[in-house]
Amino acid sequence: MSPTFFIHTFGCQMNMADTEIVTAILVEGGFAPAEDEGTADMVLLNTCAVRANAVDRAGNVLSHLKGMKRRRKGLVVGLLGCVPQYEREQLFGDFPFVDFIVGPDNYRDLCGIVRSVREGEQRRAFIDYDQQETYAGIDPIRANRVSTFLPVMRGCNNHCAFCVVPVTRGRERSVAFDRVIAEVAALEQAGYREVTLLGQNVNSWCDADKSLDFAGLLEGVSHAAPSMRIRFTTSHPKDISESLVRVIGERPNLCKHIHLPVQSGSSRMLDLMKRGHTREEYLDKIAMIRELVPGVAITTDLIAGFCTETEVDHRETLSLMEAVGYDTAFMFYYSVRPGTWAARNLPDDVPEAVKKARLQEIIDLQTAMSRELYQREIGKVVEVLAEAESKRSASQLMGRTSENRAVVFSREHFMPGDLVPVRITAATSATLSGEALVQPSNP
């Protein structure tokens, strides 16, 4: 019988995509997925190091696995992803029951690593950087049959003051244009209805000779899979070009949603964060986007309480939120990440209580803006890609609009994968509800 494995995944979409790659590598190597950790011969944690709370959540699962390993002789526990690359061999001191740690560039070696551990080899760390690794040639085992992820680049060269990604993921490297086009076309042929192109800084993608930028890739992908919805994330404001935005506005299967992290509305804070743009430059990009892509939804990331942030800086963040009118936002208060420029050079001098209070103001404002925006959708007919059965009721489906707005609607005869016109009848700050109108569009 094949040894079995179960993977806990934390963090971003790239980690989710990496879990699908790891699953494919293990299955090809003779391992089999388990239904849950309780029946698995090996439990892996694919970890995130971007924020302290993500590391803490992985630590809580590890504490649970420590007891499980005492009770189950032969259980193998491994750590994958950004935390091993970030904390390195120190993890063995913190979690002595962990059998191995593997960084994001070393997954091809995973089967051999596991077999060595099962044969009694001592704990080891596999955390070398490989600036060529994009996992080309590996066909991921995908968890979703409607919408999926496709990494088109890895790493980041920006070195924002607060961010560990350049430490955990290394420098930027792009998947070749022809390979991306072939993979997207294969996904369309396999019946997928939507793909999200992924990168830590996806719009800095370029071909090997730098003759083609992300706008060219996005246009090529759009033509290669005309029946699929195409999304991308995450973007850096300084790399959002007019040519890229024009492609989004012109191509009908490119989703009208751009995630554009700003982090702060204060130019002083943006300079300290090493973001490479000012408040005014960001707002100019927003104006250009809204002009070229009417009805576009813009979402963002926001950090409250970064080093030396004053009440004036915080108020500038609130006013920028109002000026942009974000659909939604990922909102956090600042936590120091050792190894970053900010950790080495700036004081973490905003009291935690102040950070939390400012974060709550940001959340309250965004919730109110989202509710107002979603309320304006009531009465409209929107096209929804049905993704799955609603978690609340088997009689409902859940899906998303081109603008990435979540919609719950009556199931009727529709199935996941259908494109369904839905009349919106109700809204909260996070979800639209509605009634399906006609036959699905499903070529």
Curated annotation (Swiss-Prot):
**Keywords of this protein's UniProt record, alphabetized?**
4Fe-4S, Cytoplasm, Iron, Iron-sulfur, Metal-binding, S-adenosyl-L-methionine, Transferase, tRNA processing
Q: What is its main location?
A: cytoplasm
Locate the TRAM domain: which residues? Answer: 375-438
Is the keyword Transferase assigned to this protein? yes
InterPro entries in UniProt: Elp3/MiaA/NifB-like_rSAM, Methylthiotransferase, Methylthiotransferase_CS, Methylthiotransferase_N, Methylthiotransferase_N_sf, MiaB_methiolase, rSAM, rSAM_horseshoe
Q: Name one GO cellular component term.
A: cytosol
Q: What is its EC number?
A: 2.8.4.3
User: What are the residue boundaries of the MTTase N-terminal domain, all occurrences included?
Assistant: 3-119
One of the record's GO molecular function terms: 4 iron, 4 sulfur cluster binding
Q: Which reactions does this protein catalyse?
A: N(6)-dimethylallyladenosine(37) in tRNA + (sulfur carrier)-SH + AH2 + 2 S-adenosyl-L-methionine = 2-methylsulfanyl-N(6)-dimethylallyladenosine(37) in tRNA + (sulfur carrier)-H + 5'-deoxyadenosine + L-methionine + A + S-adenosyl-L-homocysteine + 2 H(+)
- Compartment annotation: Cytoplasm
UniProt-annotated binding residues for [4Fe-4S] cluster 1:
12, 48, 82
Instruction: Quote the record's cofactor note.
Output: Binds 2 [4Fe-4S] clusters. One cluster is coordinated with 3 cysteines and an exchangeable S-adenosyl-L-methionine.
Binding, [4Fe-4S] cluster 2:
156, 160, 163
- Cofactor requirements of the protein: [4Fe-4S] cluster
Tell me the domain of life.
Answer: Bacteria
Q: Record's Pfam families? A: Radical_SAM (PF04055), TRAM (PF01938), UPF0004 (PF00919)
Say yes or no: keyword Ribosomal protein present.
no
Give the CDD domains listed for this entry: Radical_SAM
Q: Report the protein's function.
A: Catalyzes the methylthiolation of N6-(dimethylallyl)adenosine (i(6)A), leading to the formation of 2-methylthio-N6-(dimethylallyl)adenosine (ms(2)i(6)A) at position 37 in tRNAs that read codons beginning with uridine.
Q: What protein family does this chain belong to?
A: Belongs to the methylthiotransferase family. MiaB subfamily.
Q: Tell me which NCBIfam families the record gives.
A: miaB-methiolase, MiaB/RimO family radical SAM methylthiotransferase
Subunit and partners: Monomer.
- The name of this protein is tRNA-2-methylthio-N(6)-dimethylallyladenosine synthase
Gene encoding the protein: miaB
